[in-house]
Each structure stands twice: as structure tokens, then as C-alpha cells.
Amino acid sequence: MANTTSAKKATRKIARRTIVNKSRRTQMRGAVRIVEEAIASGDRDAALKAMIRAEPELMQAAQRNIVHKNTASRKVSRLSHQIAKLAK
């Protein structure tokens, strides 16, 4: 347990940030899940619309250090590639 007042304050701040980060991570995962479901159903138009919403979510999560920027880029790339395969 924290002994100094600054350590106690840091613990409180971490708890608040954890709640915010979990919320943002859940929102990001939900956006990705919608894209994946549209791809699985074979609906290219729905997948494109969902991807337009998911890509900014991923990039903002990377910008806020919720996920690593390479992880976000990799997810965007893989989803885009799967959507492109639907057109063929």
C-alpha cells in the first residue's frame, strides 16, 4: 500500500485512468467486432460502413496509448485486406 501522499494520489489517478481506458478499449473492440461480423456474413457494404467507424476508433486508441500504434495499424490492415477479398 502507498505510504506517501503523492503515492496515494498516484493510485487514485491510476484507478480513474483505468476506468476510462477500459471504456475506450471496449468501444474499440466493439467497433472491430462489428466489422468482423459484417465480413463473416459476406456483406461488403456493411463491412465498409463499419470499417469507416472502426478505423478512427483504432487510431485514437493508439494515440491515447490504449493499444500500441503497430497493433492498431495491423488490425486496420488485416480488416481492410479481408474487405478487399470480399469484392473478388
Curated annotation (Swiss-Prot):
GO terms for biological process: translation. Keywords: Ribonucleoprotein, Ribosomal protein, RNA-binding, rRNA-binding. The keyword Ribonucleoprotein applies. It comes from the Bacteria. InterPro entries: Ribosomal_bS20, Ribosomal_bS20_sf. GO terms for cellular component: cytosol; small ribosomal subunit. The keyword Ubl conjugation does not apply. Gene3D superfamilies: Ribosomal protein S20 (1.20.58.110). One of its GO terms (molecular function) is small ribosomal subunit rRNA binding. Binds directly to 16S ribosomal RNA. Belongs to the bacterial ribosomal protein bS20 family. This is Small ribosomal subunit protein bS20. The lineage of its organism: Bacteria, Pseudomonadati, Pseudomonadota, Alphaproteobacteria, Hyphomicrobiales.
